[in-house]
Amino acid sequence: MYKLIIRPILFWFDPEEVHYFTFSFVKFISKIPGVSSIIRSIYEVKDSRLEREVFGIKFKNPVGLAAGFDKDAKLYKELSDFGFGFIEIGTVTPVGQEGNPKKRLFRLKEDQAIINRMGFNNGGVLEAVERLKKNSGVLIGGNIGKNKVTDNEDAVKDYIICFDALYNHVDYFVVNVSSPNTPNLRALQDKEPLTALLQTLQNRNVEKQKTSTQKVKPILLKIAPDLTDEQLLDIIDIVKTTQIAGVIATNTTISREGLQSSNQSETGGLSGKPLTKRSTEVIRFLSEKSNKAFPIIGVGGIHSADDAIEKLNAGASLVQLYTGFIYEGPALIKAINKKVLGQL
């Protein structure tokens, strides 16, 4: 139904406007008594064999929603009804910001892809915190970044502000230094500044745990697919040095290789089917070269259950959807979970 009727209608309109409309619509129908239960009965796969413990957290299934879809934690409860095992909110920044000028989101239908240059548009971390205070039972990741106006030399302060604010309201953290849409952000992926940033956050993590009843919160690093093998080896060293919990591989790419759509010349990060192979290569490289020293969440171009299985077999412990969710609809979540069960 989604691919035959709903998607063709939605794809007639501007993608960013459709995104906001979809949020409002799902929020509205979920308030109708019984609708959430019906959605869960259609899409949720309940089976204890899907459960897995990764970086000390028990996930009810291995399929999550990637950051960028529910930036401000407005719809995490309703989205979880579609069968996701976890929801990653953000990227959030210390102060709310508009992001880059519109138009900034483009479909590449021929390539089953999206280009975005959103630029960390969000209402600010405190706005997200207020919504997360109402959470009851949804496993949440907090993806954190820096404000556009913050120089890289001061970036650590922005990450600490977001970390402190979200600490009691998320289950794990993701440090985003790999978006191509904030000027100079990717420079923070270089070994020296990245080690310093992650070590500072990890030190803060240990400090906060001492005054909390909670365990140390897992901190993950989200990396770009455009890193060289040498840079990926640096990432492995950094994870081991700072003792963060793991890596999310990968963010969007700046590559435009093999695209057919007329929108391919738009600047921004490319996600979707063209990223499938490269993100899996990065997962396999990190897993093999590190001797599976840390967990990896695989994301990038998952448009089918087979795509997800390929990433899990390459070394990912969990997977996340974004563009595949838009192109394939919520049935993809159920298909992946059923395929995982079929592989057992």
Curated annotation (Swiss-Prot):
Q: Which Pfam families match?
A: DHO_dh
Q: What is its main location?
A: membrane
One CC-aspect GO term = cytoplasm
Enzyme class, one word? oxidoreductase
Record-listed FMN binding positions: 67-71, 91, 143, 176, 222, 250, 272, 301, 322-323
Q: Can you say where in the cell this protein is located?
A: Cell membrane
Q: What kind of membrane protein is this, topologically?
A: Peripheral membrane protein
Instruction: State the superkingdom.
Output: Bacteria
Give the protein name, as stated in the record. Dihydroorotate dehydrogenase (quinone)
Q: Report which gene this protein is encoded by.
A: pyrD
